């Protein structure tokens, strides 16, 4: 079509502004709403607080963005494990499985929403993963002055059963001991090897092939997924456009490009997330020294030991949530401190008082401790998902006062389910009894 | 009937026709605008029963704009546009009809490009150029100064000029 000038734009906008619907249509619309309002009594409805929108509003952005990775990995587990049939992509998967190490860049940008409410955020990460040593990632964010600042280095070291997070600016070094189950889970699910995990998930879903093209002088074939349910849940009315470009000669990916948007408030404001994985260096030589976290003078060391993942831990974590919120969190995977920092319960106010006046580093350490029981319950749930124990959690509707309602359940055997009730007592029930209990859940 | 439903009925009496006109202008389909009106008031009802809305008119307006652009995003097939060369030039004295506008590719492209925007920029632009509201009125609705609204509208105009000048460029992937 012809080029559109500013004059064209203005003239057409004026034309559009003069448009009036027919009187009959307006009358129908108004009368229909009037009738609906006269009859309509909707019970109070709360919208899912989505993890990413909470994170983006966080005053403790650095800590929160680091949590994004943890959450994304945890939630990703459910589909990373899947396998399926495919032809071309199956060949790509086979190639990736042969790779011993890979380095790549990951960039993330969020835009949209009300600028008065949401922080605009841009982050980039360099990843290095090795089958032998584990993974290392260096996180940088675009500060308000437009400069890239490094704020986190994260090491996942399965052989040493540790995860280490370093905050260079605050000079903090946090070491978390992992259980055998955690390590096995990491190995099995390749959390640190995102491209492999993602490819496995894509093979399970519906994807389309894109025509060949050239990217940075390399001939590539593309694949595209638009199923909004396939991606991590970002909010209501999610839309996803996920493209992967593969070098046709090596059959290895050269770029992953994700655009995902979702509503983040009741007015329908949307946030758009743009994630790109690029600059892949497959089978890059690695040195064991690269996986030795640097230890420098003047750092504060903090060792965190998560409690074992079991029912008792889960109940302890849920107790902490009740103290902090006077209810259960809507999503059990919510391991960020934001809910507690906004709550007005005595326990939450105590926490808020305790971190008042602390430096950013001191706050990180304080919250790392604080998150232990909450992470315990989230991790227990993820392990249940991982082990296909058919878990479910109903914190969105069940409260501490619902002593006989199912708050959380998981399968123990073919004939038994374990149930944690709203008052946090636990029982083993038959599948039939569970069905009966779940039919009585509050809507 | 609850207080919140009374407030919504008052809003319907006060601004129902205006909101329906807005939805029609943004979707270019009367039937869709009628459906979205219902959806709008269902959303408002859901929200108003759980929290206090300080400026219901502004809230309704923003929600309507978001609903309309969401519909456009997910119903691209209903956005027919004839290339600019083939469409009759709009004449300001003519009274526009839906048939002429829906066939107008420029208007479809403008709406698609505006749909790619988010937040205050989109709201201010739609209020100013599609609803013909004054800068002062928009500033009051969006809790900004008239100067900020002028700047926002100017930036959007520049964006539209640049975006729509790039013939063949794909807009708004998501």
Region locations from a protein language model:
Chain B
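A short pre-motif secondary-structure segment
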Residues: 124-128
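Structural recognition of an alpha-helix C-terminal capping motif at a helix-to-coil junction
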Residues: 35-42, 54-66
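A short, charge-rich alpha-helical start-of-domain segment used by transcription regulators
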Residues: 1-21, 31-34
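DNA-recognition helix of helix-turn-helix
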Residues: 65, 136, 140-169
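Internal acidic/polar
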Residues: 78-103
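Arg/Lys-rich amphipathic alpha helix in sigma70-family domain 2
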Residues: 62-82, 103
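C-terminal flanking helix
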Residues: 16, 20, 41, 118, ...
